[in-house]
Amino acid sequence: MNVRKWRALAMLLAVLAILSACSPRETAWQATDAEPIAVSQWPENDFTAQIFPPQNGEIDFVYDYSASNRYALSFRNLSIEDAAEYVAALKAAGFAEITSEANDASAGAMLQKGNVSLNIAYSQDAMIVLIALNG
């Protein structure tokens, strides 16, 4: 993936993280509080139990912010269309869209279902899903 796409994806994720901070939270957190952990299989935990894996792509690494009630998954080898289909499937499973934004290089969405909030940022070949458990 070229540098421009990575920058667009990183910027979109940062915006989504900032927007998610607008809702009331008891636990402060920083996106830099965790190091990436390389994985090759879907992790089983309280966070990933709230969603399902995408049909396409491969999980690449995770960030464990569980002390702050958050967990991030990074995927590779999926098209922007695959990622959009995943967002649509999450909506069909009952997640409501709070907001979304897209441009030529990347897109993102904030979804919520009960006490689970999702921040999803994606571009060609990559997607990041941040899961937050609220309360």
Which functions belong to the PLM regions below?
Residues M1-N2, S23:
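N-terminal hydrophobic targeting signals that begin at the initiator methionine
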Residues N2-A10:
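Bacterial N-terminal signal peptides that target proteins for export
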Residues L12-L16:
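Classic N-terminal secretory signal peptides
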Residues A17-A21:
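C-terminal motif of bacterial Sec signal peptides marking the signal peptidase cleavage site
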Residues S23-G135:
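An acidic-aromatic pocket/loop used at catalytic or ligand-binding sites
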